[in-house]
UniProtKB/Swiss-Prot annotation:
Residues 300-554 form the Glutamine amidotransferase type-1 domain. It catalyses: UTP + L-glutamine + ATP + H2O = CTP + L-glutamate + ADP + phosphate + 2 H(+). GO terms for cellular component: cytoophidium; cytoplasm. The active site is at 399 (for gatase activity), 526 (for gatase activity), 528 (for gatase activity). Keywords: ATP-binding, Glutamine amidotransferase, Ligase, Nucleotide-binding, Phosphoprotein, Pyrimidine biosynthesis. Its EC number is 6.3.4.2. The gene is ctps1. It is an enzyme of class 6 (ligase). The modification Phosphoserine is found at residues 571, 575. Disulfide bonds: none annotated. This is CTP synthase 1. Belongs to the CTP synthase family. It holds the Pfam family CTP_synth_N. This enzyme is involved in the de novo synthesis of CTP, a precursor of DNA, RNA and phospholipids. Catalyzes the ATP-dependent amination of UTP to CTP with either L-glutamine or ammonia as a source of nitrogen.
Length: 591
């Protein structure tokens, strides 16, 4: 087993997750089996109770693990499926050690950070690195480990010490360290500054770890003189200083690393068994990146939510939209609409915000209401859903978005004016969305219906069923405490509001569709968590196809061809450039 530790310096949030994912991608393209571990030095057991404003979205895994959004990057880049133990937190380690102490496993010894906490970290990493994450169920050969935060943080000290010991335990030829550092370029001088990187590397060395590769995050490519300066003062060869400058798309980062000889360095440093053969996987990434830069037609989606000021709150949703837009060769424009600004009360309080929000919504090609929690902004989301239904605008509701679509229909089509979710109005006379029996209201963490669950399609004419490939069931990831009230189901279906997907027992409503609407779909699960750059999520793909006016032609062709082949229902034909791009992508996919 080979271990690659990715650490960061100067500031957090400079792209360690993307770099770690990109390293894994180029190694996987060489035929190696790669896994990934993310270490978060916070005391929380998991990310389940985080505010989206605090830490971005909570990513959900197949086993129900609520983890850091970086694990979403690993899964998307590497096309793997991780488990909750691939996200290691200080809370998990301390909980494990304390439980052992309570059981008497330490035989009366004084339990300390060194050696007990550090040993537990090393054991966890070695154990988890062996768990297969690919579909072929083969034990990984390389484990990429990302240490969150920055070197020198008091929270990460036990982990740094653990890896200082770990490098000797597994031997030098099986362990290397990538250090990601910022090279700022002040606008006043325009000169790239190396001092922060020098100080960061010095601090890392003082803690017992020496970087094998220094990856420099910068806005523009590094000058040779700057690279030589970092090489000299940080005691590494010039080839070990890698420039990771800003690029047009994150999908170009693996190509950027490949061009600078990172694979060759790993071959020599870790004695990796890499064959000298064409890398078809990277060829796909290059084609995808090139195509994303050439897109001309644009499609706009209004994302109506309550966390719109912080894009990381909807990281996977945005990625799923990007994957689908790229699949139909359209440039994506996401219009963030704060749902609270759509509420009638805003017309009196802040009319400018109110009109701007409605202008964004009405000028969009499609509307998406993603998941969320809490009552704030829910009435605005219902207003947006009402407009999408009446104006026959393509709509996708995810989790809470589906539940609010049920509320909107009940209020306006069933004349249940007080219809609501018991989450927001426990005393409503028409509880169309109710608390699930297994939900424990006295505890917040880990009390939801989580992880991969099966959804059975009950209707063969379902649009979503066709988009999934005309299958009988799908398995997608869930994260919710409330569900549609099954006792009221028949009232909706009499009015053309169909529950076309249910759980295995037939008790929980999973998918809704509406008759006489080009695309009005709601899903209780979160399809964005399983979307991949080359395999977009079907519900999101359907939204983009409908928004671009291509859904009907795609469905008429049996959903077997690339969606880019579906001519526009609005214009009647596709451009020759798109047809050429389609032909190229299909030839690569067939390889």
């Amino acid at each position: 087993m080979k271990y690659i530790l990715v650490t960061g310096g100067v500031i957090s949030g400079i792209g360690k997750g993307i770099i770690a994912s990109s390293v894994g991608t180029i190694l996987k393209s060489c035929g190696l089996h790669v896994t990934a571990i993310k270490i978060d030095p916070y005391i929380n057991i998991d990310a389940g109770t985080f505010s989206p404003y605090e830490h971005g979205e909570v990513f959900v895994l197949d086993d129900g693990g609520e983890v850091d959004l970086d694990l979403g990057n690993y899964e998307r880049f590497l096309d793997i499926r991780l488990t909750k133990d691939n996200n290691l937190t200080t809370g998990k380690i301390y909980q494990s050690v304390i439980n052992k102490e309570r059981r008497g496993d330490y035989l009366g010894k004084t339990v300390q950070v060194v050696p007990h906490i550090t040993d537990a970290i090393q054991e966890w990493v070695m154990r988890q690195a062996k768990i297969p994450v690919d579909d072929d169920d083969v034990e990984p050969q390389v484990c990429v480990i990302e240490l969150g935060g920055t070197v020198g943080d008091i929270e990460s000290m036990p982990f740094v010490e653990a890896f200082r010991q770990f490098q000797f335990k597994v031997k030098r030829e099986n362990f290397c360290n990538i250090h990601v550092s910022l090279v700022p370029q002040p606008s006043a001088t325009g000169e790239q500054k190396t001092k922060p990187t020098q100080n960061s590397v010095r601090e890392l060395r003082g803690l017992g770890l020496s970087p094998d590769l220094i990856m420099c995050r910068c806005s523009t490519p590094l000058d040779n003189s700057v690279k030589e300066k970092i090489s000299m003062f940080c005691h590494v060869e010039p080839e070990q200083v890698i420039c990771v400058h800003d690029v047009s798309s994150i999908y170009r980062v693996p190509l950027l690393l490949e061009d600078q000889g990172v694979v060759g360095y790993f071959c020599r440093r870790l004695n990796l068994p890499i064959e000298n053969r064409p890398r078809k996987m990277l060829a796909k990434w290059k084609e995808m990146s090139d195509r994303s830069d050439r897109l001309l037609e644009q499609c706009s989606i209004a994302l109506v939510g309550k966390y719109t000021k912080f894009s990381d709150s909807y990281a996977s949703v945005i990625k799923a939209l990007e994957h689908s837009a790229l699949a139909i060769s359209h440039k994506l424009e996401v219009k963030y609409v704060d749902s609270a600004d759509l509420e009638p009360s805003m017309l009196q309080e802040e009319p400018v915000k109110y009109h701007e929000a409605w202008q964004k919504l009405c000028s969009s090609d499609g509307i998406l209401v993603p998941g969320g929690f809490g009552v704030r902004g829910t009435e605005g989301k219902i207003q947006a859903i009402n407009w999408a239904r009446k104006q026959k605008k393509p709509f996708l509701g995810v989790c809470l978005g589906m539940q609010l679509a049920v509320c909107e229909f009940a209020r306006n089509m069933l004349d249940w004016t007080d219809a609501n979710s018991t989450e927001f109005d426990p005393e409503t006379k028409h509880p169309v969305v109710i608390d699930m029996p297994e939900h424990n209201p006295g505890q917040m963490g880990g009390t939801m219906r989580l992880g991969k669950r099966r959804t059975i399609f009950k209707n063969k004419s379902s649009i979503l069923r066709k988009l999934y490939g005309d299958v009988d069931y799908v398995e997608e990831r869930h994260r919710h405490r409330f569900e549609v009230n099954p006792e009221l189901k028949h009232h909706f279906e009499e009015k053309g509001f169909r529950f076309v997907g249910q759980d295995v027992e037939g008790e929980r409503m999973e998918v809704i569709e509406m008759d006489d609407h080009p695309y009005f779909v709601g899903v209780q699960y979160h399809p964005e968590f399983t979307s991949r750059p080359i395999k977009p999520s079907p519900p999101y793909l359907g939204l983009l196809l409908a928004a671009a006016g291509r859904l009907q032609s795609y469905l008429q062709k049996g959903c077997r061809l690339s969606p880019r082949d579906a001519y526009s229902d609005r214009s009647g034909s596709s451009s020759p450039d798109l047809e050429i791009a389609d032909l190229k992508l299909r030839s690569i996919a067939q390889e």
